[in-house]
């Protein structure tokens, strides 16, 4: 369902590595019997899919509880008769923004998950909402207000690729998916698979790529003017929808994507290799095995490592290139640029990041 025959035959079980049967609504492994479900229309190809669904529903429950607590606290504070009218307006506007944002997340993601579950003490908030929700605004809305970060990324990649014929492409850690969408549209991809482990971004992205107009409210506590406390954006695919026959979503482990060796002409890692792989050389081996002979790997992102990463593994560009060479790749053109990152038109705040972009081809 939703996967063309060629790629469907290349899917592999996340548990045992055997071929998957993907022609029925429930995907099943012919060897170990593991069954996989779909979250909405997205196959969940993770080793213990039911456990992940339970976690996601508990995260949704925690998000709902904390958002309602925050909204109640803001409204209670706004009810203080000693507050100035401007402060009351600001607090109430922020409360409305938080409430709208929660409602939109529940409408889009909650319905796909099957609703919330009571969180456990160990349950944490979903990173897709807490840390990465701004990617949805940036990818699918801010461009209408003049933000050029998406164009900046595609221009950087276009400047290093040796040919604009990406063929069958895998994007690992695709997040909100605008880069994957643009690469497919403009750099000659014939079929694209996107992989991520976070449904809170992916369910939004899948709806947008398929052609839906999704509303999502941006709210900020860092206020310069009362008119900039919150704004509801229309998230849309700027160049029209992409269908299930050419653009495929998979909730799966990006460190071990569930595909047979030699499946892809191009593998893309956007803002991924510095943050996610605990064993970067091991991950490079996985990238190598996924590429067919003559394929290429495209990387685009900074070198910003987790705070708990050993300093010895916070590789410089030169060290990274040495690891890439040892993994059997040849680096083609590359560039490093300081680029604007998540500069919101609402707040006019954001970051500058040094971003490394390169193409590498397997040589053995």
Go through each PLM region and give its residues.
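Core SAM-dependent methyltransferase catalytic element
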Residues: 327, 340-364
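Conserved Class I S-adenosyl-L-methionine-dependent methyltransferase catalytic core
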Residues: 37, 42-160
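Conserved beta-strand signature within the Rossmann-like core of class I S-adenosyl-L-methionine
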Residues: 294-303
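Conserved SAM-binding loop of SAM-dependent methyltransferases across substrates and taxa
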Residues: 176-188
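A short acidic, Gly/Pro-enriched loop at the edge of an enzyme's catalytic core
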Residues: 252-267
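A short glycine-rich, Lys/Arg-flanked "PGG" loop and its adjoining helix->strand segment in the class I
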Residues: 281-293
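Conserved class I S-adenosyl-L-methionine
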Residues: 165-175, 193
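S-adenosyl-L-methionine
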Residues: 209-255
């Amino acid at each position: 369902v939703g996967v063309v025959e060629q790629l469907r035959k290349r899917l592999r079980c996340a548990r045992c590595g055997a071929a998957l049967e993907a022609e029925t609504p429930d995907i099943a492994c012919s060897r170990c019997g593991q069954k996989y479900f779909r979250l909405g229309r997205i196959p969940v190809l993770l080793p213990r899919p039911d456990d992940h669904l339970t976690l996601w529903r508990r995260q949704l429950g925690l998000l709902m509880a904390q958002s309602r607590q925050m909204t109640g606290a803001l409204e209670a504070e706004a009810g203080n008769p000693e507050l100035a009218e401007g402060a009351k307006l600001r607090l109430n506007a922020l409360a409305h923004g938080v409430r709208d944002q929660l409602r939109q997340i529940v409408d889009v993601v909650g319905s796909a998950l099957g609703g919330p579950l009571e969180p456990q003490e160990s349950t944490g908030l979903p990173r897709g909402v807490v840390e990465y929700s701004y990617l949805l605004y940036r990818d699918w809305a801010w461009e209408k207000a003049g933000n050029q970060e998406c164009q900046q990324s595609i221009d950087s990649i276009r400047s290093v690729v040796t040919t604009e014929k990406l063929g069958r492409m895998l994007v690992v850690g695709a997040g909100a998916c605008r880069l994957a969408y643009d690469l497919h549209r403009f750099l000659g991809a014939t079929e694209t698979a996107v992989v991520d482990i976070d449904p809170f971004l992916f369910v939004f992205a899948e709806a947008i790529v398929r052609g839906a107009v999704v509303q999502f409210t941006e709210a900020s506590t860092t206020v310069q003017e009362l008119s900039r406390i919150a704004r509801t954006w229309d998230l849309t695919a700027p160049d029209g929808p992409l269908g299930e026959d050419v653009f495929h979503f998979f909730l799966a482990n990006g460190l071990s994507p569930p595909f047979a060796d030699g499946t892809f002409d191009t593998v893309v890692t956007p803002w991924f290799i510095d943050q996610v792989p605990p064993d970067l050389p091991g991950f490079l081996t996985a990238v190598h095995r996924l590429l067919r002979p003559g394929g290429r790997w495209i990387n685009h992102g900074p070198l910003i490592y987790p705070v708990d990463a050993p300093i010895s593994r916070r590789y410089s560009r030169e060290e990274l290139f040495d690891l890439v060479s040892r993994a059997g790749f040849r680096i083609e053109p590359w560039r490093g640029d300081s680029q604007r990152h998540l500069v919101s038109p609402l707040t006019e705040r954001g970051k500058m990041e040094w971003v490394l972009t390169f193409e590498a081809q397997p040589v053995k």
